[in-house]
């Protein structure tokens, strides 16, 4: 609701106003400029609701449930260095593809893709998530063993320090180091929400760090916010070719989403769009295609008229 100070967007679709007619000699009101956008937005929303249901995928980016999201607990320090200072660089290496490592004893090769720090997700030890690329030298081992030292398979730079291939980088805890977790991810795409077509970035949420039998409702948490020049420097006036910090521009209304998980009993969906439902590791619902609205009813009726009831 933007019919508040200082915007006073009093657009009311019940009045059937479809244009704002500015007149010479009369000042333009801020609420009229905002109302102009609301009139056009209402048209977009009406069309969008005819085609798509709320939360529908418009431009597919892909969704994926990963029940083999392998986790590994590591010690907080290695060679006297706090490993948290370079974990971000480990997962952002190779343009976000992660860093390949090898077990010093086992010979197992894997790529570190993600990590969480205590107390996130209730973990009490630093946990990395690995995609295994190669089994051990014994031809049987497929997960890093307890106490294993991990060696870099490629160079890694953090700050002013560069670690080279074959340098050791992490050490696993002595007991119960490896487990199988679970995660859910979406690829970049567009979804219809709140009457607009929202760009969604590639993202992933860890469902359970040490279990492949999660039970959750997973989807987008929708966030609506007003952004001012104090929040974003790009909103200051740049008419002279540079940012004029003495001249803040208009605020912006922003809609963004992030992946979130909820219990199976939580149906407070005011700001939540469900994409996936899983119970004890078994998929119960997965929205991976567009969900059509009124137009779907039309095509169903036409098919029935042409071909009858199958």
List PLM regions with ranges.
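Subunit-assembly interface segments of extracellular/virion macromolecular structures
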Residues: 1-310
């Amino acid at each position: 609701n933007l019919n508040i100070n200082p915007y006073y967007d009093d657009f009311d679709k019940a009045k059937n106003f479809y244009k704002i007619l500015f007149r010479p000699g009369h000042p333009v009101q801020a609420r009229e400029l905002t109302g102009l956008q609301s009139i056009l937005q209402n048209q977009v929303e009406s069309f969008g609701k005819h085609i798509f249901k709320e939360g529908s995928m418009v431009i597919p980016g892909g969704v994926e449930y990963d029940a083999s999201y392998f986790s590994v607990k590591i010690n907080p320090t290695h060679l006297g260095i706090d490993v948290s200072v370079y974990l971000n660089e480990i997962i952002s290496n190779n343009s976000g593809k992660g860093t390949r490592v090898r077990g010093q004893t086992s010979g197992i090769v894997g790529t570190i893709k993600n990590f969480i720090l205590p107390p996130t997700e209730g973990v009490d030890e630093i946990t990395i998530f690995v995609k295994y690329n190669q089994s051990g030298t014994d031809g049987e081992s497929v997960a890093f063993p307890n106490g294993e030292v991990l060696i870099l398979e490629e160079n890694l730079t953090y700050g002013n320090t560069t670690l080279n291939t074959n340098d050791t980088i992490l050490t696993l805890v002595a007991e119960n180091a490896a487990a199988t977790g679970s995660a859910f991810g979406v690829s970049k795409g567009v979804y219809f929400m709140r009457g607009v077509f929202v760009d969604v970035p590639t993202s992933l949420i860890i469902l359970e760090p040490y279990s492949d039998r999660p039970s959750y409702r997973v989807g987008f948490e929708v966030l609506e916010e007003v952004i001012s020049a104090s929040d974003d420097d790009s909103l200051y006036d740049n008419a002279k070719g540079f940012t004029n910090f003495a001249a803040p521009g208009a605020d912006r209304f922003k809609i963004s989403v992030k992946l979130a998980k909820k219990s199976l009993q939580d149906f407070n969906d005011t700001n939540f769009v469900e994409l996936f439902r899983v119970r004890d590791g078994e998929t119960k619902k997965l929205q991976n295609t567009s969900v059509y609205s009124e137009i779907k009813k039309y095509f169903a009726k036409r098919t029935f008229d042409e071909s009858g009831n199958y």
